[in-house]
Amino acid sequence: MILLISDLHLEEERPDITRAFLELLGGRARAAEALYILGDFFEVWIGDDAMTPYQLSICQALRELSDSGTQIFLMHGNRDFMLGKAFCKAAGATLLKDPSVVDFYGEPVLLMHGDSLCTRDEAYMRMRRYLRNPLSLWILRHLPLGTRRKLARKLRNESRAQTRMKANDIVDVTPDQVPQVMQEHGVRTLVHGHTHRPAIHKLQIGEQAAKRIVLGDWDRQGWALQVDEQGFQLAAFDFVPTQLALPGSP
């Protein structure tokens, strides 16, 4: 059994989401062959050298899962694209390129965060190309921590404001992009997050049936895609109501 999640947007200000994630790590994920996290794992990430005690506790929780035998794969999102090799090494995770084709029980499946499919949002795509440029990344990683924190707050606030102003179809995937990218990678199944619109969409690519599975964001409830030999099951679950102690708390 394989689990896929995305868009947890983990931050210390949302202990309910953190508790739900830790519950997943201690439960279903222990029985999984692998856990795939397809971006926006953290609400913000300014560099592996700037881990807060809270972020370090999440890293340690992932390491415990990895040490138990579950493989962990992390993909960058638009909020945490500066996650690096140091964090992944400490967490016992493998950094996965976006996009990546993986084999799930004999079927090739395309995994993406999903933001690169939203090509109608031209302003965002320009910003994405700039921020993901290797030179830009090098500069960002070498800025003073205080500057990085201010820049992260500015980008996050601007992103939230712009998203509220944009039409729904602009911030969703571009319909023509989906079959195009699936054909380019030779797959009939695409799994992505980013849009916060969980669903399984049935498609027709040429003469072949296909599907696009959109993972849900963790806000009022959690979402996980379970893959096994019987197929794909996307389901929501309620957050854990009990007041569990967070890692690192007294």
Curated annotation (Swiss-Prot):
Principal localisation: membrane
* Any one GO CC term of the record: extrinsic component of plasma membrane
Alphabetical keyword list: Cell inner membrane, Cell membrane, Hydrolase, Lipid A biosynthesis, Lipid biosynthesis, Lipid metabolism, Manganese, Membrane, Metal-binding
Membrane topology for this entry?
Peripheral membrane protein
Concerning Pfam families, the annotation shows: Metallophos
What compartments host this protein? Cell inner membrane
Q: What class of enzyme is it?
A: hydrolase
Free-text function comment from the UniProt entry: Hydrolyzes the pyrophosphate bond of UDP-2,3-diacylglucosamine to yield 2,3-diacylglucosamine 1-phosphate (lipid X) and UMP by catalyzing the attack of water at the alpha-P atom. Involved in the biosynthesis of lipid A, a phosphorylated glycolipid that anchors the lipopolysaccharide to the outer membrane of the cell.
Name by which UniProt lists this protein: UDP-2,3-diacylglucosamine hydrolase
Species of origin reads: Pseudomonas fluorescens (strain ATCC BAA-477 / NRRL B-23932 / Pf-5)
Lineage, top ranks: Bacteria, Pseudomonadati, Pseudomonadota, Gammaproteobacteria, Pseudomonadales
